[in-house]
Amino acid sequence: MSVELWQQCVELLRDELPAQQFNTWIRPLQVEAEGDELRVYAPNRFVLDWVNEKYLGRLLELLGEHGNGLAPALSLLIGSRRSSAPRAAPNAPVSAAVAATMAQQTQQAAQVVVPSEPIVVPVAEPVLSEVEEPSSRDSFDSMSDSGSVPAASGRTEQRTVQVEGALKHTSYLNRTFTFETFVEGKSNQLARAAAWQVADNPKHGYNPLFLYGGVGLGKTHLMHAVGNHLLKKNPNAKVVYLHSERFVADMVKALQLNAINEFKRFYRSVDALLIDDIQFFARKERSQEEFFHTFNALLEGGQQVILTSDRYPKEIEGLEERLKSRFGWGLTVAVEPPELETRVAILMKKADQAKVELPHDAAFFIAQRIRSNVRELEGALKRVIAHSHFMGRDITIELIRESLKDLLALQDKLVSVDNIQRTVAEYYKIKISDLLSKRRSRSVARPRQVAMALSKELTNHSLPEIGDMFGGRDHTTVLHACRKINELKESDADIREDYKNLLRTLTT
């Protein structure tokens, strides 16, 4: 059984699965041929069990179909093809929230063919959460004396750690970024559950935890939430949060001070290392070399590592393959843009924190039109609140239109029915004229319904106007299309993924 056949079947499976499922469960797998047997290595026990339960059956079907009908001999192991022997399966507890979320996101179950040990499932503490990202602060400075820095007042907590009498570390955690202030929705549910598992069981969770996604989606908030929870459980813990560029600057400073050994000892002595925007290590060879050894030392010592990036680790250009491989040893989770309901919840919670009365229809109006990320959503709300305060008026949809007129005009310009039709046609590889035609074949009718539903959600056009722009159709046809797509989004994983991808493309 060749490795090439496995890779061919994995590519076929990629086409069948939503991108997040493929990246989380299939992409981290490594494979090697041992005679007529294929050995498939998972980075940890949880990935192994999940692949075994949900995807192995389909993989075996594909291997049989494309391997001349021969049933393959296949073994699932924990470890890496580069290691001399597979690692023993750890007894890591899996949070109920994580398990429940995984089950929701996986649509097709496969036959279980490899026995696995039972998993202990503790009940995770129910928490409501919210999304925001602060800037990182200085972390590693030369010392002229042995005095420590007092805790800063306000939102940010400053902690100082003395190292070898020559260096100090000041780690800043935003105390408002907790699990309680994080608004949870479908888009971030898995990431939040995994972060909670790490925070509550740092010695038995996922290591490293790698969160990736666009800007302003809550990756940094979750990272701070973990750090704050660890310090709440153990105030003496050494929890270090910093931006990747700060790590580079610290290393350069240590080299200039001839203090590289102290630098190494410090970073390898922390209980938890939280590094934001790991993609900035790209093409910095010396920094990658130092971080590689720091990362290995921390994992070998059982210390927790949490990383974030704006993209999937394998897609970070200029990052060494050995680092990408190690990032896959733990759990890699995407943080998606928030869906409409979550955006409304974020706005209502922010307004409540600001002690401002925000009518639900006003929150819905803002959430419908500001879709790219939470940071822009909160910025829009601040403008509305300021406008309301200065004008001495209650917040209404009319006031929102006045205060956000430039943003709304830009949004209307970027998202037009013409643009939606063009994007949907390209996505489904059909012609725009097909969308406007009277053809009723499934290959055309379904994309047309998707385009109509997107037009209703993303533009201010009425149903009759949308119908007119789709070949002169009646408004009842548009209404039927919108209802049909909403139903399919609940029952059809492919339609749900298509709609989400198109929505992201049109609003980013």
From Swiss-Prot:
Region Disordered, residue ranges: 130-160
Source superkingdom: Bacteria
InterPro entries: AAA+_ATPase (IPR003593), Chromosome_initiator_DnaA (IPR001957), Chromosome_initiator_DnaA-like (IPR020591), Chromosome_initiator_DnaA_CS (IPR018312), DnaA_C (IPR013159), DnaA_dom (IPR013317), DnaA_N_dom (IPR024633), DnaA_N_sf (IPR038454)
CDD domains: AAA (cd00009), Bac_DnaA_C (cd06571)
Main location: cytoplasm
Binding, ATP: 216, 218-220
Summary of subunit composition and partner proteins: Oligomerizes as a right-handed, spiral filament on DNA at oriC.
Protein name (Swiss-Prot/TrEMBL): Chromosomal replication initiator protein DnaA
Species whose genome carries this gene: Pseudomonas entomophila (strain L48)
